[in-house]
């Protein structure tokens, strides 16, 4: 049985997000730092959020190559919500092409066997249905070592090379509980763009998560919070682990969107170690009171 939190979500989670507009950044589509939408299906949530963000055309120019980083790590079906929602993925791919993208690629360095994860998650079929290509990321030769200036622990990493060759980089995590890091959202999802994840786990995981954001932050972060795993993450055990929140978050600030997601899962952002470290490193804004935030309920 899946618990539904849609009725009280606005007051108890998204309602905690401040709706603040500074004089230097007037409110209105295209002027928001973060958009939070609730009460809809994954596609309608996404479309309204992007409308408030100013449209995908803000991020993609004609002829550009786009790479998408969903969560497609787990060999489980969509109804288990361990991976990014396939309907959302298809809508994003289509939107990228409408904005003028020449090519749209998606990939993940999966935790379970990659072909089964791609197929059974529904993500690969969704990307293809939208006209994009799902790329394999299971072989070390697909990765190139880079330096990460300013990092404290993760000073080097082997990064997926096609990401480096792309013009636009969009991060599409699913909001979940995680046994090792309490939450997994946008910052944690980037572990799927590197080859040696074991180094992170052996060398201060939270610091490595923050360090990697110094290399290349996504141009846009779209957080799937429609069906949310609130326990037994990141893979989950059954649908009993899930809460139907029917929400979606969008921001170009990877720390801000994680801070908002942390609140949705009932945590103060500063209590999540990698978020606090990222704030201290200047990765983004953890204080949501300093941002222009648009909250929308689709009734």
Can you say where each PLM-predicted feature lies in the sequence?
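N-terminal and secondary-structure boundary signal
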Residues: 1-299
């Amino acid at each position: 049985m899946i618990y539904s939190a849609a009725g009280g979500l606005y007051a108890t989670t998204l309602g905690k997000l401040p709706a603040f507009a500074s004089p230097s950044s007037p409110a209105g589509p295209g002027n928001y730092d973060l958009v939070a939408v609730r009460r809809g299906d994954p596609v309608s949530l996404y479309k309204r959020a992007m409308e408030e963000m100013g449209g995908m055309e803000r991020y993609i120019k004609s002829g550009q190559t786009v790479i998408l980083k969903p969560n497609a790590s787990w060999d489980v079906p969509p109804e288990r919500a361990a991976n990014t929602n396939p309907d959302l993925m298809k809508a994003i791919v289509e939107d990228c092409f409408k904005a003028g993208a020449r090519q749209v690629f998606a990939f993940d360095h999966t935790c379970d066997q990659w072909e089964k994860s791609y197929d059974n998650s529904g993500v690969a079929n969704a990307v293809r249905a939208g006209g994009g290509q799902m790329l394999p990321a299971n072989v070390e030769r697909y990765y190139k070592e880079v330096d990460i200036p300013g990092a404290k622990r993760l000073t080097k990493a082997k990064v997926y090379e096609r990401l480096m060759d792309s013009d636009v980089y969009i991060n599409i995590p699913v909001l979940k509980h995680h046994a090792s890091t309490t939450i997994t959202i946008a910052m944690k999802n980037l572990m799927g763009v590197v080859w040696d994840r074991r180094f992170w786990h052996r060398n201060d995981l939270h610091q490595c998560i923050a360090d990697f954001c110094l290399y290349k932050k996504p141009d846009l972060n779209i957080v799937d919070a429609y069906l949310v795993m609130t326990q037994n993450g990141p893979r989950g055990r059954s649908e009993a682990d899930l809460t139907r929140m029917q929400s979606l978050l969008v921001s170009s600030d990877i720390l801000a969107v994680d801070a908002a997601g942390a609140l949705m899962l009932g945590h103060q952002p500063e209590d999540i170690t990698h978020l606090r470290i990222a704030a201290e490193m200047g990765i983004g804004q953890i204080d949501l009171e300093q941002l222009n935030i648009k909250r929308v309920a689709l009734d």
